Amino acid sequence: MSTLNTSNIKHETSGINTLVFDNGGTSGGNGRVTTKGTIGEISALGNKTGDVTIDFRTANNFSMTLTGNIVLKNPSNCAAGQSGVIYITHDGTGSRTWSAEAYWEVPGGTLPTLSTGANAVDAVIWHARTASKITTQVVLDLSPSPQ
């Protein structure tokens, strides 16, 4: 395999079937480039309390554990068409609350109350209509299906 260091590559039909990028992404010659961040990897944000600003350039899917109440700030590097999920797990105390800044749009304009149980898991499913309008749907209290 050869290494090419450049900031711009034009990929034409030239006998090259696939380009492989050092971030784990590929280009299959169909005009699409897949980078590691678009494959569905979940970026763990760790324990969170207070202001939380997510950098959407780093991934599309995120997880965090609430150790206190949070304010979900407007994300940085949001691109129209981007989408993903934010998994919110409560610590062993539970009963954490949240608020969100204006980019985050929810049905009816009112954020739902997060689950209150210790170790409860909620999911914020999001899609960026524009760089400053993020449509969200919150799924509360994720639990295994009964068998």
What are these regions (language model features)?
Residues 1-59:
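Intrinsic low-complexity, repeat-rich intrinsically disordered segments enriched
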Residues 64-147:
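Acidic, glycine/polar-enriched metal-coordinating patches/loops
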